[in-house]
């Protein structure tokens, strides 16, 4: 009986192990197509505490958007030949964190496949257009001083000198600071012998200094 107990205790940890799904990654063997992935992170700090709202997201061809906390963040991919498959968001006091990402080609349809010519155009012309729109009634932001109405800042366009090679960003009147990060990578890079170099772009209004972007707490919306 004691021997049986020892055997069961030895086998118990293995009985709870979960194996990863076996995906067919032969799609990466295609000689005339490349499979590129994309991740876009946006961190936006508003000028007042966030409203309690339900997260809503939409994914469309070459772009996606998410709304939460009184802010809508939309991302459009121009000349990138890429699509998003997931959208996530996390809020904390006065800040919205959003993530837009694609999935590996062996896990989802449609795939982000492109020809070599498309890849060249991507590296030269891809624009990640990020637009932050406030969903708070603008009439609430008017203030009266000596019976004169003071108009809020309608739109704040980021100076071109601060924009990276891929990111173009425009924020609405309620946004104080924005940080954005873009990564375009070879989804088959860990499988094939020669991978395509990763493209990265980073932008922040925080004195141009890189900041750590919160990623782990972002949940799918």
Swiss-Prot record:
Pfam families per UniProt: Orthopox_35kD (PF02250)
Gene3D superfamilies associated with the record: Major secreted virus protein
Residues in the signal sequence: 1-17
Keywords: Early protein, Glycoprotein, Secreted, Signal
Cited InterPro entries: Orthopox_35kDa, Pox_vCCI-like_sf
Glycosylation sites: 72
Keyword Transferase: no
Subcellular location(s) per record: Secreted
Record family assignment: Belongs to the orthopoxvirus OPG170 family.
Stated name of the protein: Protein OPG170
